[in-house]
Design a protein with these regions (language model features):
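Beta-propeller blade termini and top-face loops
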Residues: 1-8, 12, 53
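Alpha/beta-hydrolase-fold serine-hydrolase catalytic core, especially in secreted/extracellular enzymes
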Residues: 27, 34-216, 222-238, 245-297, ...
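The conserved SAM/SAH-binding core of class I Rossmann-like methyltransferase domains
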Residues: 242, 330
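Residue in the alpha/beta-hydrolase core beta-strand immediately N-terminal to the catalytic nucleophile
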Residues: 303, 326-328
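Glycine-rich nucleophile elbow surrounding the catalytic serine of serine-hydrolase chemistry
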Residues: 306-318
Length: 378
């Protein structure tokens, strides 16, 4: 179901509210809801809302003040809905319906232009990315400098990450062979019914999760399997990969649709916003949970590698985990602010923590991390 960002009120579902509640607040005042059978917003939701609202109008003995209509068109405000609206208004106002099908005068195109030259930017308006840039600069200018503990506390709140993380349950999955390498697979339950996939390259005992004291852990951009295929020169030592929720093996669609403007990643991110959570924060939490498992299995030192989306996740993981010995980030954005300066970026919206610039930015986090571990960026 395509939705634009303004249709994701932060924390709405988390507070127990739903769309119907906004209409219920109008009871017993007159209200008509207009829908369409072939709308890409599923008509089942429209019917459910209408039935809930009608129930409350009945409680107030004002059933005559409520109506809902489902037309036979796709998304839009068509003639059938217009007629229904006018009829309802006239009923409430106790007015006679004079003409439901008036003659429509088609305006000339030039009379409908928003500006003389058909370009509002030429008339002095600012594009949205310039407004964002200016607002961000003001936020950054007034941002308080935080010490390491303050930084961790504020980012933890921003990403909604629990301070205490238990060792997660895991189960062994069937292994497979890739480019002559045996790949062990392990499903790690980071939350109830949320399974992320841990992979071990060249696993000698793939039916058993045996972890070395020092390992290399890779967080891929989209898919661990793709990066295993591409990388013929693994670092020395034992190499592990992790597919966090919504990436790799848990992607609900094929990779070619991942960056679709209204794709699943965008929708999942929006749902987390509605629940007052952070999709990126949950991915960071996934990795931190896996680190707890690896530590319980005897791992004491981790060399962390992150590519693009995985690098962003890795920045926050490195801040919170003492197991990390070194980090290597590939295709890591210079900063969140640098992405705001551009009119368009391909990076999915799920990688932008809401409100992060009020707290910090990537370079400041790297400065803190760099005081205790080695950082390489390419």
């Amino acid at each position: 179901m395509p939705q634009d960002n303004e249709q994701y009120p932060p924390g709405l579902l988390g507070e127990g509210l739903e769309l119907a509640d906004f209409f219920i607040s109008r009871v017993p005042d007159p209200l008509i809801i207009l829908g369409q059978k072939y709308d890409f917003f599923d008509v089942r939701g429209f019917k459910e809302i209408s039935e809930e609202v009608l129930y409350f109008y009945k409680l107030f003995n004002s059933e005559e003040n409520f109506s809902f209509f489902i037309g036979t068109n796709p998304h839009g405000y068509y003639t059938d809905a217009q007629k229904e609206m006018v009829s309802f208004f006239c009923k409430i106002a106790k007015r006679e319906i004079i003409n439901l099908e008036p003659e429509i005068e088609i305006e000339k195109s030039e009379n409908l232009f928003a500006s003389k030259k058909r370009n509002v930017i030429l008339e002095g308006s600012k594009p949205h990315y310039i407004i964002l840039k200016e607002n961000s600069e003001e936020i950054i200018k007034n941002r308080k400098k935080l010490n390491e503990e303050e930084l961790k506390e504020n980012i933890r709140k921003c990403l909604k990450i629990l301070e205490n993380i238990d060792v997660p349950h895991y189960r062994v999955l069937p292994f497979f062979s890739l480019k002559g390498k045996i790949i062990g697979r392990y499903a790690v339950e980071t939350e109830e019914n949320i399974w992320v996939i841990l992979k071990k390259v060249n696993a000698e005992k793939p039916y058993f999760l045996e972890v070395e004291e020092e390992i290399n852990l890779y967080i891929p951009d989209i898919s661990s399997e793709d990066e295993i295929k591409r990388d013929n020169k693994f670092k020395e030592g034992k190499n592990y990969f992790i597919d966090v929720r919504g990436l790799g093996e848990s992607m609900p669609v094929s990779k070619k649709f991942f960056f679709h403007p209204y794709g699943y990643d965008y929708m999942f991110d929006g749902l987390f916003i509605l629940f007052g959570e952070s999709y990126l924060g949950k991915r960071v939490y996934d990795v931190l949970s896996v680190l707890k498992l690896l530590n319980s299995k005897g791992c004491k030192r981790i060399n962390l590698y992150g590519n693009c989306q995985g690098a962003i996740i890795g920045v926050f993981v490195s801040l919170f985990s003492d197991l990390i010995k070194s980090v290597s980030f590939k295709n890591l954005p210079e900063s969140f602010y640098s992405l705001i300066e551009k009119p368009y970026v391909k990076l999915p919206s799920s990688n932008f923590p809401k409100g992060i610039l009020k707290i910090t930015d990537i370079p400041e986090i790297l400065d803190v991390i760099g005081k205790r571990i080695e950082i390489k960026i390419s």
